Swiss-Prot record:
UniProt-listed GO biological process terms: vesicle-mediated transport
Molecular functions per Gene Ontology: protein-macromolecule adaptor activity
Role: Involved in gross chromosomal rearrangements (GCRs) and telomere healing.
Keyword ATP-binding: no
Name of this chain's protein: Increased recombination centers protein 6
Species annotation: Candida dubliniensis (strain CD36 / ATCC MYA-646 / CBS 7987 / NCPF 3949 / NRRL Y-17841)
Gene: IRC6
Length: 275
């Protein structure tokens, strides 16, 4: 089977291996010393859900070698990385990528640096795909904010970073969280897994579904929805649904048409699950 590819890009100590661990479920991850560079690391793994099976290569790269680097130097190195990435030499890699995760250290990266880095990430996004799909790349991009173990980032800093990322039309994921938020949306570690598993992958094998089991599951879902609709003790929280729709509409306004279609299907599925 032809493998799919995602790229995790970031500076040292920004959560790249933690993300790879989540995606691969801690399989095939080499034991690395803190001092070792992660540039060029390739983790070969696989994903299996109840719907599909696929092979996945997780590519990890760094744009500088030192953890203690001034913002100007970090931006310069990130820009150099982008210039190399968009060259003809890396054309084949750009064509096969299904996803990109850019990692930041919310404790050590300044707000100024993050803002400038997001401008470069936007340029990287525009370079992805082949000539026929120019500006309409079907992959996913997420900016993942991490924090060193046993350290805490203030809530107002996290919110400021999230607002900056969203203003660039990108998704922000806080690696320090997990579970669901107040709108029943996956967040943090669970959102990373959901983002990967719900993607429309280029190369996969569909899992054969037993027709009788499928019908049984569908009937059970219908009965559950019917029960909630008629049982006064389990009222539906319509306010939560409307809030979710409004947030989804705001987020979709910055997406391409292809991204809007995929995002709309995802939201519909989430609302059905919520019901």
């Amino acid at each position: 089977m032809i493998p799919n590819h995602i790229l995790i890009l970031g500076s040292p100590n920004s959560g790249k291996l933690r993300i790879a661990n989540l995606i691969s479920r801690n399989e095939e991850i080499p034991q690395l010393e803190d001092a070792e560079s992660h540039s060029g690391l390739i983790i070969k793994t696989s994903l299996r859900t109840k719907y599909y099976f696929l092979k996945l290569n997780i590519l990890i790269d760094e744009y500088l070698e030192s953890k203690e680097t001034p913002d100007e130097s970090k931006l310069s190195e990130l820009h150099k990385w982008y210039q190399e990435f968009k060259s003809e030499e890396f054309g084949e890699l750009r064509e096969v990528l299904d996803g990109l995760m850019f990692t930041i250290n919310m404790k050590t990266d300044s707000i100024s640096f993050i803002g400038e880095a997001l401008e470069i990430i936007e340029q990287i996004k525009l370079s992805l795909g082949d000539e026929e799909s120019f500006h309409n790349w079907g992959g996913f991009i997420a900016v993942v904010g991490s924090c060193p173990v046993n350290q805490v980032v203030e809530d107002d800093v996290v919110l400021e970073i999230e607002d900056m990322v969203l203003s660039h039309g990108l998704e922000f994921i806080n690696l320090s969280t997990e579970g669901e938020n107040e709108y029943k949306e996956k967040q943090g570690k669970d959102r990373i897994v959901e983002l990967v598993e719900s993607h429309d992958w280029t190369n996969l094998e569909m899992v054969k579904v037993d027709s009788k089991q499928y019908e049984a599951n569908k009937l059970a879902k219908i009965e559950s929805m019917k029960h909630k609709l008629i049982n006064e003790k389990e009222e539906l929280d319509l306010d939560d649904i409307f809030k979710k729709l409004n947030l989804a509409r705001d987020h979709a306004s910055s997406l391409t048409q292809n991204e809007k279609d995929k995002y709309a299907n995802k939201i519909i599925d989430e609302i059905i699950d919520f019901l």
